Amino acid sequence: MEKINRRIVLLVLPFMAMPIMGQEKPDEEALPTLVKDVETTIAADVVSQYIWRGQDLGNVSLQPTLGVGYKGFSLNAWGSVGLSEPKDTKEFDLTVAYTIGRLNVGVTDYWFDAGLDPDNRYFKYGAHETNHVFEANIGYDFGLLSVQWFTNFAGNDGVNKHGHRAYSSYMEVTAPFRLATCDWTAAVGAVPYATSFYNTNGFAVTNVSLKATKEIRVTDTFAIPIFGQIAANPRSQKAYLVVGFTLQP
C-alpha cells in the first residue's frame, strides 16, 4: 500500500505544480529583443476647442491616440470627435513615420466626415469621391528650433487659382522652452501658395501660437498634463484661447 501511495504522489505532483508555473511572470530578459523594444502609446486629449493649423474645426472635443514605435519607426492612429456639438468635425488619421537623429519623415492618411463622398464612407478611396487626404512631411530639429514641411499629394486636396490640384502645403517653425515651471512651445505656421484647402490666395501666415503645459500630480505614479494655448490666424484675422488636459497611463 505504501508503494502505491508513493506512486500516486509522484503522479499528482507535476499537475499540482502546473498552475503555479502558469502564474509566474515572464522573465523580461527571456523576451525576444523585438518585443522589448516596441513602445506603445495610449492617450486621450480633451480640448475646449479644436484648432488645427489656425483653422477652427470644432468645439469641445475628445482626441484619442493609439500607437506603436520601434527603433525610430512609428505607426499612430489619432482621432477627434465633438463632445458638445454633434456636427463638429469627426476625424480619423493614420500616420507612419521614421525618425533618425534629428531628421523625421512621415506620411499621414487623414479622414474627415466631410469631403467628396456624401455617405462619408471610410473605405472609399476613389480619386474624385473620397474623404481621405494623403500628406507627406519632412522635418528637422535644430535644437532651439524645429522646422516641418507638409504637402498633400493625393485624395481630397484643394485647388489653386487655376482650378488644378494645389498640392496644398504648410510649413511650421516651433521653439520649445521652459519658463516658470511650465513647458512652453511657440509656433509660427504659413501656407506658401494659393489653395482652397487652407483658404488662401497666396503666401499667408495662418498660425501664430503659444502653448504652456504643466503636470498636475495626482499620485506618486500618475499625473495629468494640463495645457493652455493662445492661437491666432492672421490670414482670417481670428484668435482662439484653448485649454485642455491629457489622460495617459
Predicted regions and their residues:
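Short loop/turn motifs that connect adjacent beta-strands in outer-membrane beta-barrel proteins
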Residues: 24-39, 106, 177-185, 213-226
